[in-house]
Amino acid sequence: MMKIREFKNSIEFKNDGQLSLFFLGTGGAFSKKYFQNNALIIKGNSHILIDCGTLCPLAFSFFNSDITQVRNFLLTHNHADHIGGMEEIALVNMYGTKQVPNILITDEFKKILWNESLKGGLKIKGENSAKPTMSFDDYFHQIKPKKIKKSPRPFYEAKIGDINLKIFRTKHIFTDKNNWKNSYYSIGVLIDNKIIYTGDSQADKELIEWLTSEFNIECIFHDCQFGHNAVHTDYEELLKILTPDLRKKTYLCHYSDNADQQKDRVMQDGFAGCVTRGVYYDCE
């Protein structure tokens, strides 16, 4: 079960050892009310930020904290609401903290992230330098996850301090509905073998059934849109793929600005609720 704990003063990057999630934002790409769906995982002395969108540095400031405190990142895909803050992360660390942040990332996505998103703003250092042309490795330290064999989809594992993370491919944007292999690169995260964080995903019964059959899942944070959406999980579809028992464990996130109008229905339909930004979700 998840216990909700209030935010006080500034974001905590350490705790007494329980697994906690703090959502900087809970909104979709175009939300003007909820910031973007980016979440900090904390456990003991360890932390990692899942996604860092264009508004993420501002969100940290909103919660009286500095994003340069984040030393570990995991990015689910290269849409701006998930990676748009990473150019700032690269530059404020290079010229400010003089530290190199860690990114948990596969070789496949490392190439996509650099060549298709970050390279345009970071390739040229812009000063007299013995190395005027920069690369991903000049700004970030790659933590490469280990591939897990015998899984129905690419499945990787790594540890960030005390936090165990497994990443899996999701169906977000694709050209063939029946084949995730043709889909745009996007991942979800299994945290400490008990929390599913879907990232951006369409309704994916096969994925949920696989994870819940293999692991003792205590909580699911699921992408959800209220109204038809071609690249996210529609609420009506989610009702169809989640059993009543799973709904009790599921919090909805990455929603649009009309979510307030749906919260009563969400509870009536048996979900744990809509995620609230700015509180701690502690795994008991």
Regions found by a protein language model. Name each.
Residues S201-E284:
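Cap/insert and terminal regions of metallo-dependent hydrolase folds
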Residues M1-I196, Q261-E284:
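Binuclear metal-dependent hydrolase catalytic cores
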